[in-house]
């Protein structure tokens, strides 16, 4: 008697691969049960729109062994498209709550990506302000001269004296102190650099007048702010900055001694006065003693440049001491400053470890 073997039919399924919009990219028939389906076509794409660009991420649902007919749909990650205006803050960008404004660019955060550092180390053509452009981002380098050897960057890297580091140039965030019909008085929310008020304790004679070390009109910090800082921070856009008539009268100095008071100045960038830092409508404590409202954090760049920094508890790391434009009547080398605990105190004009917290007046129509 003739023997017959049973015919075994393999179970197979149809696997369909679709793009985000339902377009069929590939159809695989006869996919055997218990095997893992594979997509063999071109990588799925999704066109960028005005706000986002899209990159293929994977499939939904997650690809698993075949146990039934299945449709897989391509999924994508989205990345917000940043315009040059936003990336470089070439124009003022007001926050949704109106409390801060991004405007200008300055070195701030240490670059600790070894691959990126190797790449930008090879750059040889700096921009006019000394920064380097790589893949749409600006970088600046500096030889570290920390105030203390124990200082670190925000990423935890120790700051070693004499070593050269790279820093990413990022939009400056300004605190809005006042807004009068679109004319804003704004103050940097971080300490951006380290600089002395004047580089000597000696007085000098200009136009037959004795000029003391704490004279703001003839100070090194005023020159630096309106030259080097201004030309770097606003190299890509400065149309909104107003030339400001700066009041340097005795009433702005926190006292009534006119000995060291200088003439009013006209500036595009300037330091706030003692009076500014005790004005409640600007958000500051009216007293001169310790106040959180005057706390201000140092940037990585500023710490590397030699600024004093100190943590005030766990919640306020790397707070800095910074200059005002106001002379202190204690002596001809004394200026008012804000210490790391937010108190208005005497600083010496020639100290190079003072932080810089600039302010500007801008017009937004």
Placement of each model-derived feature along the sequence:
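Signature tryptophan residues that serve as conserved aromatic anchors
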Residues: 17, 56-59, 174, 323
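Surface-exposed interfaces of beta-sheet-rich extracellular modules
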Residues: 11, 35-67
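Short structural boundary motif marking the start of a folded domain
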Residues: 11-16, 99
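Short, solvent-exposed loop/edge segments of extracellular or virion-exposed proteins
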Residues: 14-34
